[in-house]
């Protein structure tokens, strides 16, 4: 039976999240049309496939990242490979096309070996594979990316020149396309332009569905397609200032301020202060795009020969001069954010007396809110774990314990309970990770030592 696979690799800020939300929420409708959207690599984004393919383990990040489910990268990826193989083996015969999507493919698979690893993971399940990648004019991409950088904790004043590290692997589009073409074959790589005609309506979800050969009624899915909305310019600058305040309080804090506190702060800012964010000037944007003129031209010649230029060369919608956010706008943003946090009420609340007082008030309120939220979230996770335990639902029990560890990675009780569950299920790798994590911080912990002894006993038991 012939089966093909469409591999959507991003890039970022080209509607990937909207595509993934629609695909994940319409799995049944897609299956009726012969398309299969896997769930084991992720309910929406298939980020676990990215992690499984990465040759550079340094990109895994902290072993306590939510993606690792409380058991670290090695154990989680081992479980994923088993789950993925089982899911692929059970694809209904009538599904002749598999669709895989994650913008992290283009962001994190930065070398040919990583791309080859992904190819080898997917090759057993498809006779042909086609890579789809959306490209966006570089200055427009960065302006959109800035809000995301703030959410990630990389809170610096916007400057196109500071993007050089990203640009080396992200904005040279001919290098990006060639890396995937070397592995999958040039005729199986299909670049698409994000909003290819200036001033016309472009819907990336509709475009991708057309590429997949699918048809869905999208009128009832409008809410699913709104994702990663921009933060207003004042909100962005407020976050930059708050990040500076966090760094000043903690001299050991590095450039990145990502933390549960920061995630809550950026979520509140996104909700309270949406709008058009920072934009470069016309001259800045033009100079930035011109850096990649040769690369863009090669992509145009190879894949878009009928176009005069790869991207629309019109920069007139951008400001001529830099747009600054004054103290009054920042104070207003701080007041609105505090109202969203529940620390002030009503539109008549007095603004902070000056800029620094506003920042300090928001940060202090945020710290108090984060502590209260952490207690509340942990209480919910505790209740969920107990309910799942009572019901005998081991998967939900594990998920609730992993949630507790996301809230507090130092929660030894939750980690040991999770270890015991995995040991009972026969997953020694996951159990060993949890036990080792406790013993690294609490070398003589009796509960951890007891589980370590059980692990040793199971490894030496006759089979």
Give the ranges of each region predicted by the language model.
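Anion-recognition interface
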Residues: 1-381, 386-390, 420-424, 458
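Canonical positions in the second alpha-helix
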Residues: 369-370, 403-404, 437-438
